[in-house]
Amino acid sequence: MASFGELSFLSEISNIHKSNKKHEIQSAGTVALDNGVESPYYICVQVENQGIEVYHMKDERLFASCPLPEKTRFSCSPIYIKEGNWHYIWTCTSLKSNGEWKILLWKFNDLEEESEVVYRDISNQQIFALHFISSTGQLVIVFRNGKIAFLDPEDDKVHMSASVNESATLLQSMYVPSQANPIDAVRLASNEASGTNNNPKEIEMNSDTTSSVPKSGSTSFSANVTSSTSMVYLLYSVHVDKIIQYYVDSFSVSERRLVNTRAVVLKEVQAPSHILMSKDSTSIYTISLEGLSIYSLHDESKSYMLIKILHFQSISKIEHIELISDNFLLIQHDSQLSLWDITFGTIQDVYDLKQKPTILTFTCYKSSLKKMNQNSQLTGYIAVLLKKGLAIVPYTLPIKMLLADAVGKRTSKIGKLRGTNELIGEGVLTKSKNGPSMRDQLLKNIQLQDHSLRDELISLRSLAEQKNTIEFDAKFLGVVERYQNQYANNCKILKTSSVLPIPFAHAIESLLFSLDEENELQVSCAASGTLNYLIRHRLFSYSTLVQKGFSGSVFDCLYKFQKDIAFNFLERTSDISAYEIACAIKTAINSSKVKLLRSALARLSLFDSTTSREALLLAFVPEDFDSLFKTLGNLVVDSNLASVKFNLETYIYCLSVVLDAMGVGGVASSSENLEAARILYNDLQEKLTNLTAMSLVLPAISEIVKRKKDVHAERVQFYANPQPKAIVDDMGDLATLLKKDFLSEKRKGKSQRARGKEIDMAIGKYTVERLEI
């Protein structure tokens, strides 16, 4: 699941002076491009009246600083290029004294500590965005008036190339490198093959491409091919007859001209409050009162068409929006940051900063904690500017959003699973009052260093080899009793008398199991009393048993041996794997054991969605998935089948894991699955309707609690109300209306408690009648 980490401050830089002028940004930031790839650690921050600073996110420190005059202001976000030890930062600045806008280049060497600031004249035009072409070393300049120009590194001059609609208001500019947009790449390639491209500017630029490629910008393809497919996309709005229309223009870097214009066909009645373009320009996201609308590029109509609308809470209070990945939006509303899942439409996590922030930039890189692609996550830092200073908030996102992640309940922060072994070791399912915890076991194992059990272990080993199970159980229980009596005083410290040293318990466990000819686990010594004691007192270690390197499942082995022991193993073993739980679910489905299924589902809900899904895929076949899907659907639909110990959320989470594992094709593979899905959908929709109706009763119930004492204390004359079902606008008048509605004669002669009870019943009855109306 997606989640935030804990905030930490980098420096005391902050927004002191407020800028309310149009086309001026008070503060902004960007991520360094290292050989054309976004760096996960280096960011650049510019703050009005204070200067430009570079920070290292991993070390959480200031890396370099470029102080500027006090009255310096900015018109665009900076662009940050890192080539070895050299750092290059471009931005558009102006002094408030003369008001002339220029391009600022700050370059420094972190090894030799060299630094230089250079200004370039741009005829006093404000810049909207800057883009760096790594293959040619050129800088693409997008001015606020819609003009597009190039800053050539050879002659160090600005060359105008194209311009968008004169009445356009630029909203976003996005640079997409080569091969990132196949639609425009194929079109440009066909033009070059047919010889329709006769632009002299392109020929001139391609001829000089090789000499302008930076040494650090090494690529595996030629610069000519790279520049032929690189595009700059401009999202802008145009006012036509009091109607705002949105368009996306495609600017070819190689041809240096606008190649096409695509319209955004909005479905909203009113103009959206926020509009955003994806990084590859194939999607448009708009936020309005109707919800979050997602538009996708339609090839035939050459426009952006609506594909779905997602509804979120507090959608009218949004102040800032950023596309943090392909599946998540970073939203700021008031002082809160939130991660919105745009796959299923859920708010994954919310972080309250206690004060309104300014989002500067964010880093994003693939986590290397897990090797498998489906387990990989995106992690990074969000840089925000607060009154106290510059701060960063870490976050983590799943690369592929699963349904189970959308419906799962978060119980922990970054770096932790939904359930931990410590919680399971405490016995969250079948915890006994006198049962020991893993902490108590470890504490006693450290405090009580006993070597007298070695002789007992040797004798038990000989009994196990002889398969004398009766004497083995008697011998083991005798050892336990003598051990408890010997250390009775020490056990008072731990408040338990049922603990053995953990190494001794693990040694006993290894005597009970062995491998057969097919390398499968089997109970070689059927000492059920000993095995039951180890499992019930949580001394059984699954991790120790796994070291034998067997194939198959421990649960299946115990289930064949004795069903009660297998059930206790499922509930009381702290380090059990998700695969063992999946095997238990499969056994419960095939044998129709409802109690076993409930316990297995409860244990499965403690794992993260990816681990649970992989365990099910490893243990199940398609026929087993069909049976499990129908069974879980019945548990969700029929409340009589569900256990009182586990809430409905557990079943819904496990059902979502099953749906992720089956996929759309698996659900649609049979008519029975489709019928079960239809019944499940109708039932969940009915439950949501009932919950909505119940939520309307809450104000009336709170009114009862708030006014009950006041009603008892009041002694006034009551009169009958001629309109008992009149609509009450103010909830505070509800109790007064009901007191007038019911005849005061019925209250005469009754006790104070009886009168209060009658009023409570009347209020509840009135509430039900109003809901029916």
Swiss-Prot record:
- The lineage's top-level taxon is Eukaryota
Keywords recorded for this protein, A-Z: Cytoplasm
Q: Where is this region: Disordered?
A: 192-219
Query: Where is this protein primarily located?
Result: cytoplasm
Q: Provide any one GO MF term from the record.
A: snoRNA binding
Keyword Transport on entry? no
Query: What InterPro entries does this protein map onto?
Result: Utp8_b-prop (IPR018843), Utp8_C (IPR053881), WD40_repeat_dom_sf (IPR036322)
Question: Subcellular location, in the record's words?
Answer: Cytoplasm
Query: Which is a GO BP term held by this UniProt record?
Result: maturation of SSU-rRNA from tricistronic rRNA transcript (SSU-rRNA, 5.8S rRNA, LSU-rRNA)
**What Gene Ontology cellular component terms go with this record?**
cytoplasm; small-subunit processome; t-UTP complex
Question: What's the name of the protein?
Answer: Uncharacterized protein C1565.05
